[in-house]
């Protein structure tokens, strides 16, 4: 075997057969992590607030779940509860986190949950903890020009987040910072993934917050689109990114997970191309000002590790098809389509 090939093989050495703890296993991203980990041969221990809740039933139907998936009831704010879940695991994917702009519900639970997972990981001597942070911890800085590429060295301005009452971004930033501090103190190998807005097929039966972002343009509830931009990434790519940074010994630090940024006008154009039968808005709510320029997010670090991103158009198409297949979005009949077009 050539030296380069041997080195590559060693770098991505098979670690299937290991047990990975996935927190908040029933969530949108976490469900995909569980699915892909099982497909790769891992044993998965998923933490949930209530494993018996019907909304988590999809996990038990995943391929390999019967043999290699255990769902455990865990309160992430109870350190002993977290320790029990992590004990005996080789790695942890910490994905569970509140998604809210209520500061009391967002900040403290996110910070304490992250700390508890790192402490539990240290005690269990796990090989690596992979923490799902967010682009919200990275790009909120009024002093950074939109023309400057946002990369892993960037952090959100906490005072700006507080001033604008963006408690989601504030909570994500302080939770990630706390995770880094505790990991350093406890000697835990921590790697962080910072995804942008995540879309793609739903595995869970409920609609998640990011999917509502698309749904409103298809149901007719949004009559116009905003003069705003958003970066997108496929949920499968986010799950793969976590597995990649867990498996690659050389992975370290933070990894921005973004495919591309679109203006809302570009977003609705793609939706209208694939799904012309829906009442997708064609006018911007702000036609006086020039189009807002999108942020430029670097995804070089993940690409260098070998991640191939799914094109945003494919991601949007699969998101809508999933909403249709699960009954969250009705499919208009021909008469409705003609009415929309006229």
Swiss-Prot record:
GO terms for cellular component: cytoplasm. Pfam families: Epimerase (PF01370). Its EC number is 1.2.1.44, 1.2.1.-. Disruption phenotype: Drastically reduced growth and lignin content, as well as death after flowering. Its main location: cytoplasm. Keywords: Cytoplasm, Disulfide bond, NADP, Oxidoreductase. NADP(+) binds at residues 24-30, 49, 55, 75-76, 95-97, 168, 172, 195-198, 210. The formation of a reversible disulfide bond reduces activity by perturbing the positioning of nearby catalytic residues. Pathway: Aromatic compound metabolism; phenylpropanoid biosynthesis. Disulfide bonds join 161-169. The active site is at 172 (proton donor). It catalyses: (E)-coniferaldehyde + NADP(+) + CoA = (E)-feruloyl-CoA + NADPH + H(+); (E)-4-coumaraldehyde + NADP(+) + CoA = (E)-4-coumaroyl-CoA + NADPH + H(+); (E)-sinapaldehyde + NADP(+) + CoA = (E)-sinapoyl-CoA + NADPH + H(+); (E)-cinnamaldehyde + NADP(+) + CoA = (E)-cinnamoyl-CoA + NADPH + H(+). One of its GO terms (molecular function) is cinnamoyl-CoA reductase activity. GO terms for biological process: lignin biosynthetic process; phenylpropanoid biosynthetic process. It is an enzyme of class 1 (oxidoreductase). It is found in: Cytoplasm. Mainly expressed in roots and stems, especially at the sixth internode and, to a lower extent, in leaves and flowers. Localized in vascular elements, with weaker expression in the interfascicular (xylem fiber) region. Involved in the latter stages of lignin biosynthesis. Catalyzes one of the last steps of monolignol biosynthesis, the conversion of cinnamoyl-CoAs into their corresponding cinnamaldehydes. Mediates the conversion of feruloyl-CoA to coniferylaldehyde. Also active, with a lower efficiency, toward coumaroyl-CoA, caffeoyl CoA and sinapoyl-CoA. Involved in the production of floral volatile phenylpropanoids in flowers of fragrant cultivars from cinnamic acid, a common precursor with the anthocyanin biosynthesis pathway involved in flower pigmentation. PANTHER family: CINNAMOYL-COA REDUCTASE 1, NAD DEPENDENT EPIMERASE/DEHYDRATASE. Belongs to the NAD(P)-dependent epimerase/dehydratase family. Dihydroflavonol-4-reductase subfamily. This is Cinnamoyl-CoA reductase 1. It comes from Medicago truncatula. The gene is CCR1.
